Regions:
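Short, solvent-exposed beta-strand-terminating loops
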Residues: 1-3
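Alpha4 helix (beta4-alpha4-beta5 surface) of REC/receiver domains from two-component response regulators
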Residues: 5, 20, 64-68, 72, ...
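Well-ordered alpha-helical segments embedded in enzymatic catalytic cores
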Residues: 35-38, 72-73, 171
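Surface-exposed alpha-helical segments enriched in charged/polar residues
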Residues: 41-44, 75, 79, 123
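Long, compositionally biased intrinsically disordered regulatory segments in eukaryotic proteins
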Residues: 89-186
């Protein structure tokens, strides 16, 4: 629901009805994999346009249920792309420590705020919220933009070290891709 609603909102930024239709066609898709092998196959196929990966900890790998499959999946994806957002979901809080150690975001499936926490991570790390330019040293907010027009109006006001920080980590490309603005994002 949330991703589809955001895609509809982004389409309204288009200049004309044709551009809005193109944006809706290019909107982000949620892909579901039931095994490690399916997940890696989907990642390999779509990695150039992947906004992020959300994984459970336990699921089948090599034909058997594997209690480490989620960590193995995210570790293997991280080897290919050090900046793609990776979110681990688990009902076992002990997995949070390992997720933190591996630099994966973590969501506790037992949390009463699960949907809010997941939505926040998707907004902040997968390009669906405002784009927040940060100081690369302090991580303090420098500027915030909600639309492509605001980005255009503010881009030359952003300090070069902040711009380089975000560009080198594909943050801006991810934000543009979430809005189906592919030619600019590349």
């Amino acid at each position: 629901g949330y991703i589809l609603q955001q895609s509809r909102n982004f389409a309204t930024e288009a200049l004309n009805p044709h551009a809005a239709t193109l944006r809706m066609r290019g909107r982000p898709k949620v892909m579901l994999a039931r095994t490690y092998e399916e997940a890696m196959q989907l990642y390999e196929r779509y990695k150039d346009n992947c906004l992020g990966v959300i994984s459970d900890v336990r699921f089948p790998m090599h034909g058997a249920r594997d209690s480490e499959a989620g960590f193995k999946l995210l570790e293997d994806i991280r080897k290919q792309d050090e900046y793609v957002p990776l979110i681990m979901e688990s009902s076992e809080t002990a997995n949070k420590y390992r997720a933190d150690r591996e630099h994966f975001h973590f969501v506790d499936k037992n949390s009463k705020m699960l949907s809010v926490e997941l939505r926040h991570l998707i907004e902040e790390h997968m390009g669906f919220g405002d784009f927040v330019f940060r100081d690369p040293h302090t991580h303090k907010e420098i500027a915030r933009v909600s639309t492509l027009k605001q980005l255009q109006d503010n881009i030359f006001k952003i300090p070069s070290d902040s711009m380089l920080y975000h560009i080198s980590r594909n943050h801006i490309s991810r934000w543009l891709c979430a809005r189906a603005i592919f030619p600019v994002s590349k």
